From Swiss-Prot:
Domain of life: Bacteria
Reactions catalysed, as given in the entry: a lipid A disaccharide + ATP = a lipid IVA + ADP + H(+)
Gene (name only): lpxK
Role summary: Transfers the gamma-phosphate of ATP to the 4'-position of a tetraacyldisaccharide 1-phosphate intermediate (termed DS-1-P) to form tetraacyldisaccharide 1,4'-bis-phosphate (lipid IVA).
UniProt organism field: Shewanella baltica (strain OS155 / ATCC BAA-1091)
Metabolic or biological pathway, per its Swiss-Prot or TrEMBL entry: Glycolipid biosynthesis; lipid IV(A) biosynthesis; lipid IV(A) from (3R)-3-hydroxytetradecanoyl-[acyl-carrier-protein] and UDP-N-acetyl-alpha-D-glucosamine: step 6/6
Name of protein: Tetraacyldisaccharide 4'-kinase
Pfam family, one: LpxK
Keyword list, A-Z: ATP-binding, Kinase, Lipid A biosynthesis, Lipid biosynthesis, Lipid metabolism, Nucleotide-binding, Transferase
Length: 339
């Protein structure tokens, strides 16, 4: 099914025309919904600290999580105490839940588990971002909130909107769901503060981001530094349960890894030992960092993951920090109208 969807959204499959009436209906619904917030008919809750929303206007992964991690580290380096909120995709969370270090993906979602494992940032997940934001402030006293994937969650007031675009796939066929991958029309990009192009090249007004691979590490938690080595010249099986698995596989090939088999899974895929053991067939198994947090409890010795770090320009850092300081100085907890 996902293969057919990709053909419709990114390869010009003619089925998109049959779905176009549904896309028109979706466009009306999204426009009316946003208008209700802009007109004040539906309420938007402002936070007493600056809120940075990191999202996209397309379905699927675009590089939001590496961007969130980059922002966490950038803000810490400049004296801020950031915290993160998220929906916790694929997890049924009643109310809100604090993401503790070591929390499983089954409890809080794969991306929250990965973000906290990497950064130890204060983080709260919940279906209602406003409740999660209030809990984050009350429990941790953060001075900046980063909302991971909440661009269309207009009930939460925001001060800075940052959209991440997949530089390879772009906006696909440019159509709204279900005929295309768009959650909102391309016009929405004109209203955000920052557009980050993952993989570039960046268009005018955008900031290019590259994902730089780090060292390969074992998925199995009890294998400590210095007790392992990875030979990238050996044949291996690569797997990825992310929005665009092909990007991960292409990156591995470019780095010289010998891929005997590439297996893409749906984003947020749940795994079990039998599925992956049968896939690997005794060959080393190399996966993404997001996949690794879901496999630690049953990982074998020859299962590995490759983390990536986002790289952005000093100009991006300067402009975002300047905007954030401006917001922080003026913040009085009053309503911030949606733009």
């Amino acid at each position: 099914m996902q293969a057919l969807v990709n053909k419709i959204w990114y390869q010009g499959h003619p089925l998109r025309w049959l779905l176009l009436p549904l896309s028109w209906l979706f466009a009306v619904i999204t426009y009316v919904r946003r208008a209700l917030f802009r007109l004040g008919i539906k309420s938007q809750t402002a936070m007493p600290v600056p809120v940075i929303v990191v999202g996209n206007i397309t379905v699927g992964g675009s590089g939001k999580t590496p961007t969130v991690i980059y922002l966490i580290e950038l803000l810490r380096q400049h004296g801020f105490t950031p915290g993160v909120i998220s929906r916790g995709y694929g997890v049924d969370i009643q109310g809100v839940k604090t993401v503790n270090l070591g929390a499983s993906a089954a409890e809080v979602g794969d991306e929250p588990a990965m973000i906290v494992a990497r950064t130890q940032v204060p983080m709260v997940v919940g279906a209602k971002r406003v409740d999660a934001a209030n809990a984050l402030i009350a429990e941790f006293g953060v001075d900046v909130i980063i909302c991971d994937d909440g661009l269309q969650h207009y009930a939460l007031g925001r001060d800075i909107e940052l959209v991440v675009i997949d530089g390879q796939r772009g906006l696909g066929n440019g159509l709204l769901l279900p005929a295309g991958p768009l959650r909102e029309g391309a016009w929405r990009l004109d209203a955000v503060d920052f557009i980050v192009n993952n993989g570039g090249p960046a268009a005018k007004g955008q900031f290019e981001m590259q994902l730089a691979p780090t060292e390969v590490k074992p998925v199995k938690c009890d294998v400590t530094s210095g007790e392992y080595s990875f030979d990238k010249s050996q044949p291996l099986v690569a797997m990825a349960g992310i929005g665009n698995p092909a990007r991960f596989f292409e990156s591995l090939r470019a780095q010289g890894y010998q891929l005997a088999l590439c297996q893409g899974f749906d984003d947020h895929q749940a795994y079990d030992k039998t599925l992956l053991r049968d896939l690997a067939q005794d060959l080393p198994l190399l996966m993404t960092e997001k996949d690794a947090v879901k496999c630690r409890d049953f990982a074998q010795e020859n299962w590995w993951y490759l983390a990536v770090n986002a790289k952005l320009s000093p100009q991006f850092d300067e402009q975002l920090l300047a905007r954030l300081r401006e917001v922080a100085a003026a913040k009085q907890g009053n309503f911030h109208g949606i733009r």
